[in-house]
């Protein structure tokens, strides 16, 4: 295994030594196995290629302050992948198989778990693909489950900072009752045109609901969080603060967002999931995107070019989002007690 400079490791793919694979044929899953071969022998008419029959996940393992490794909420990822599989008429990966594959990937790549204090983590990309050859439209009956581990650098190489977002009304990431609630590649591919256009402007992209283009759906590939206060924007007590996040059948239920909502309630905040009109940003003191990659990505402003409107939230991350960010990171790195049972500790 090549030497890795953890201090300069970026947020990108790094080749692991082993990946884990399992196959589904004749109605049953094989045993998972480790392999150094990173290439698939795949028929050109496989349903994953012809019709996009695939789903994936993303989760992390952290080297804690005590030197132990913690895997964060992998069971929730297993359950979400099962829902995605059912949504695309694929054989769900049993939770037990999912967990075994994650642990095998970790055991076979222990030297890829970054040291504590680097901000880097070991990322796992579980992937489920349809492999049955088909030309006629229809689902496959054979599937491959793969876990790809890769060490990744911190989302914020320096200081926890803000990002600017721009509103997009011309591209719909997912339909209200389509695949938006599942973690499938087509949702992300559908957003590339809009997100790349935003990146060329130095921004990221907010998607609105596909039906009316009125309500906030997602921030690029992440859930949206808004913080509302009943009086002065940044000076108030917690019982006067509301944590807002969209409720929609077109967005992916974020495990990070679910964790943050739990922590927000413990802080005494009111937590609300509902449809959020874009104009309600005017009433928010803080806003952010949230997900596995970044945990929380604070927003300094949202630009609505069509309405010639800019919503400002401050050039620095707000106090509520900052507290939530550090509280969750402290749990993941073992700096505070995990009272929720979110992490599974491995003494390595």
Which sequence ranges carry the predicted segments?
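Charged, gly/pro-rich active-site loop segments
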Residues: 95-97, 105-119
């Amino acid at each position: 295994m090549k030497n890795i400079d953890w201090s300069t490791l970026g947020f990108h793919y790094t080749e692991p030594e082993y990946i884990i694979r399992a196959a589904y044929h004749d109605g049953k899953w094989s045993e998972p196995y480790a392999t150094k071969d990173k290439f698939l022998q795949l028929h050109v008419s496989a349903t994953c290629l012809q019709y996009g029959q695939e789903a994936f996940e993303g989760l992390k393992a952290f080297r804690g302050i005590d030197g132990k490794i913690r895997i964060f909420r992998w069971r929730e990822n297993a359950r979400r992948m099962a829902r995605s599989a059912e949504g695309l008429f694929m054989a769900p990966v049993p939770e037990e198989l999912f967990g075994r594959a994650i642990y095998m990937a970790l055991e076979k790549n222990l030297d890829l778990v970054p040291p504590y204090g680097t901000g880097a983590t070991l990322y796992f990309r579980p992937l489920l693909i349809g492999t049955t050859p088909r030309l006629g439209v229809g689902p496959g009956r054979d599937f491959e489950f793969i876990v790809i581990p890769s060490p990744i650098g911190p989302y914020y190489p320096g200081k926890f900072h803000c990002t600017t977002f721009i509103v997009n009304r011309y591209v719909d990431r997912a339909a209200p009752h389509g695949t938006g609630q599942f973690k499938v590649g087509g949702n992300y591919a559908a957003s590339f045109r809009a997100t790349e256009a935003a990146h060329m402007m130095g921004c990221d992209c907010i998607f609105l609901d596909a039906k009316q283009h009125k309500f906030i759906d997602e921030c690029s590939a992440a859930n949206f969080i808004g913080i509302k206060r009943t009086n002065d924007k940044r000076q108030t007590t917690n019982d006067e603060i509301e944590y807002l996040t969209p409720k929609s059948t077109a967005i992916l239920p974020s495990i990070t967002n679910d964790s943050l909502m739990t922590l927000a309630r413990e802080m005494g905040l009111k937590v609300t999931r509902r449809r959020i009109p874009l104009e309600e940003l005017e009433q928010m003191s803080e806003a952010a995107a949230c997900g596995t990659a970044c945990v929380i990505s604070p927003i300094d402003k949202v630009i609505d070019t069509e309405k010639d409107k800019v919503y400002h939230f401050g050039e620095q991350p707000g106090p509520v989002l900052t507290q939530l960010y550090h509280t969750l990171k402290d749990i993941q790195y073992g700096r505070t007690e995990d009272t929720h049972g979110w992490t599974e500790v491995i003494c390595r």
